[in-house]
Amino acid sequence: MSIKIKSMLILLILLTITLVFSDTFQRLKELYENTKTIKVSFVQKVKYEWYPKADVSKGIFYASKGGKVRIDYYSPDRVSIFVDRKKVVLVNFEEKVVYIESIKRNTSPVIASLFFLSEQPEKVFKPIGEFKEGDKTVLLLKPLKKDENVKEVKIYFSKDGEILGLKTYDAQGSEISINFIEVVRNYTPTDELFKPSIPEGFKVLRYE
């Protein structure tokens, strides 16, 4: 599973969790339940245990209840990712390659439970703690099932209960952090937003 695909699925985890592990997040639950569509501008950093310099990407995340998801990375490379309950489609505009991967190839128990098998979040994650970092509230979660891709997750909230971002760690010590720059809820998507298209002349690689 590529870093970008794994990072995208980590975002899905964030948007799937209802986060009702304490009264502090009751308002967040209500906000989540009233959200039909969401658009998030974000900055993503990936730090590897074996490499000192972080990989930094910028992009926009779109999602609609019912499993429609799109991510457009525009820096440093232009990459678009589409996902539904059957496949993941990654369009790399720099390499002129389209990767199509079956959901059946997914190897993450956390991702499978939350997104593909629609398990309730409280059956997948265990809350470890809740603490303050400056004016932010941090919720620490660990998966109930052993998962090499997701060892623990930190989710950051403002004092108003808005999600500011998250950090996740894998078994090898790598860290993915995603900071939310702008969040728009309940917009009206175009009919084409969640439909992947293969640009003319691009090579197509399928992994079924």
UniProtKB/Swiss-Prot annotation:
The keyword Membrane does not apply. It comes from the Bacteria. The keyword Signal applies. It holds the Pfam family LolA. InterPro entries: LolA/LolB/LppX, OM_lipoprot_carrier_LolA-like. SUPFAM superfamilies: Prokaryotic lipoproteins and lipoprotein localization factors. Residues 1-22 form the signal peptide. Keywords: Signal. This is Uncharacterized protein aq_1483.
